[in-house]
C-alpha cells in the first residue's frame, strides 16, 4: 500500500493508475487478516468487542478525515493531484515505522508450524464458524455499493458539490458508532447487535427506496452508517472467539 503511493503521483496514463490501484488493493488484502489476528491475540477476552470496535472506529475516521484533508489540499493547491499523492505517502510511512519499531507480536505458543490451509486445519474450524461465514456471505448479498447511495442523493436533488459530504456523513456515523457497539458486545451477546445491524440496513434501504427529498436520503445515510457500526466489528469479534488461536489469521482471511 505504501509503495503504491509514489507511483500514483508519477503515473501519466490510465493503465498506470489502474496498476497502482490494483497494487494498493492487494496491500489491503494482505494486511487485513494479520492485523485482526494480532488484535485478537493481544486483547483480553473481556474487552474483545471494545478493541475491535475501536479499530473499526479509527479506520472509519480515517475514511472521512483523509478525503476531507485531500479536498482542502486540492483547494489550496489548485487541483495539484500529484502533490496530494505525495502527501498521502506521509501517514503510510508513519504507520509502517510504528509497525516495524513499536508493535511487538507475541511469540506463538506452539513452535511447530502446520499448513493452515490443509484439510486437517480446515476441519479444526468449527461448524459454528462456517455458519458465521455463510451468514456473512448472505448478509453481503443484501448490501449494495456506496456508489448507489451517492447516485440516489444526486437523484433527489442534492447538488454535485454537496454529494461528497453524503459519504462523509456516513463514515462519520460509522466511526462514532463502532466503538459503542463494540463495547456493548462485551456485555451482551453479539448476535443481538448483528440483528440490530440488519434492522438498520433494512430501514436504510426502505428509506432510500421511498425517499422523495434530501432530508430522507440523509436519514437513510445515518441508518446505513449505524448498520455498519453495529455489524463490521461484531463479525470480527465472532471470528476471534470461534477460531482456534493458531488459525485466527486463516479464519480472518
Question: For each predicted feature, which ranges?
Answer:
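C-terminal membrane-cytosol helix-exit motif in multi-pass small-molecule transporters
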Residues: 89-110
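Structural signature of the two symmetry-related core transmembrane helices
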Residues: 1-6, 89, 192-207
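Glycine-rich segments within core transmembrane alpha-helices of 12-TM secondary carriers
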Residues: 53-68
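Helix-loop boundary and gating motifs at the non-cytosolic
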Residues: 129-166
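Juxtamembrane intracellular "pre-TM" segments in multi-pass secondary transporters
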Residues: 105-135
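Intracellular juxtamembrane helix-capping segments at the cytosolic ends
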Residues: 30-43, 230-243
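Transmembrane alpha-helix termini and helix-breaking/packing motifs in multi-pass membrane transporters
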Residues: 65-85
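Helix-to-loop junctions at the C-terminal end of transmembrane segments
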Residues: 74, 177-189
Amino acid at each position: 500500500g505504501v509503495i503504491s503511493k509514489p507511483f500514483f503521483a508519477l503515473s501519466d496514463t490510465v493503465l498506470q493508475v489502474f496498476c497502482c490501484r490494483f497494487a494498493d488493493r492487494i496491500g489491503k488484502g494482505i494486511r487485513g487478516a494479520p492485523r485482526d489476528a494480532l488484535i485478537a491475540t493481544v486483547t483480553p477476552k473481556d474487552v474483545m468487542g471494545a478493541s475491535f470496535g475501536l479499530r473499526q472506529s479509527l479506520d472509519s475516521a480515517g475514511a472521512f478525515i483523509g478525503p476531507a484533508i485531500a479536498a482542502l489540499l486540492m483547494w489550496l493547491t489548485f487541483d495539484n493531484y500529484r502533490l496530494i499523492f505525495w502527501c498521502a505517502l506521509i501517514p503510510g510511512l508513519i504507520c509502517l515505522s510504528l509497525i516495524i519499531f513499536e508493535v511487538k507480536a507475541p511469540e506463538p505458543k506452539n513452535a511447530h508450524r502446520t499448513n493452515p490451509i490443509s484439510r486437517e486445519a480446515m476441519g479444526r474450524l468449527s461448524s459454528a464458524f462456517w455458519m458465521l461465514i455463510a451468514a456473512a456471505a448472505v448478509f453481503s448479498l443484501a448490501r449494495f455499493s456506496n456508489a448507489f447511495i451517492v447516485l440516489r442523493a444526486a437523484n433527489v436533488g442534492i447538488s454535485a458539490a454537496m454529494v461528497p459530504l453524503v459519504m462523509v456523513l456516513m463514515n462519520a456515523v460509522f466511526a462514532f458508532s463502532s466503538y459503542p457497539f463494540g463495547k456493548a458486545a462485551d456485555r451482551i451477546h453479539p448476535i443481538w447487535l448483528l440483528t440490530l445491524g440488519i434492522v438498520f440496513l433494512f430501514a436504510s434501504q426502505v428509506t432510500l427506496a421511498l425517499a422523495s427529498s434530501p432530508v430522507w436520503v440523509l436519514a437513510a445515510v445515518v441508518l446505513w452508517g449505524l448498520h455498519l457500526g453495529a455489524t463490521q466489528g461484531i463479525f470480527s469479534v465472532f471470528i476471534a472467539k470461534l477460531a482456534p488461536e493458531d488459525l485466527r489469521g486463516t479464519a480472518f482471511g
